């Protein structure tokens, strides 16, 4: 009887620990994916590396998020943001923050650069597991194909 209860207790503890672990899903190299998007997707202008601090300020990612990205070197709204969060819940939070940032950019573009608003509307914003990707480019389909390759 003692062995049965010991085995039952061990099983319950393992289930409890597994439930607390969170689901991080697929892990990606954020810099590699950002570089791949920069090198293989057309943009309206040259792309320059964005300081991580700038992205963190704009997107307010949860603690423990690895983030990389590029921005347009001119007045265009082209951008790449790739983030690997600690878990799916953090990724959902970052996705919502990124959507808010994208909506703010759309309002700004509507006032100052109406032509850019349509590009922002067609942007790739994707969350899969603990990964969040934003890509504003001239070819959303090409960006989507690259991202899907990393998330398989």
Q: What does each model-found stretch correspond to?
A:
Residues 1-4, 8:
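Positively charged n-region of N-terminal signal peptides that target proteins for export
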Residues 71-103:
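Mature extracytoplasmic domains of secretory-pathway proteins
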Residues 28-47:
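Post-signal peptide N-terminal segment of mature Sec-exported envelope proteins
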Residues 21-24:
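Bacterial signal peptide processing site
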Residues 15-19:
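C-terminal motif of bacterial Sec signal peptides marking the signal peptidase cleavage site
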Residues 46-77, 89, 120-121:
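Short, compositionally biased low-complexity segments enriched in polar/charged residues
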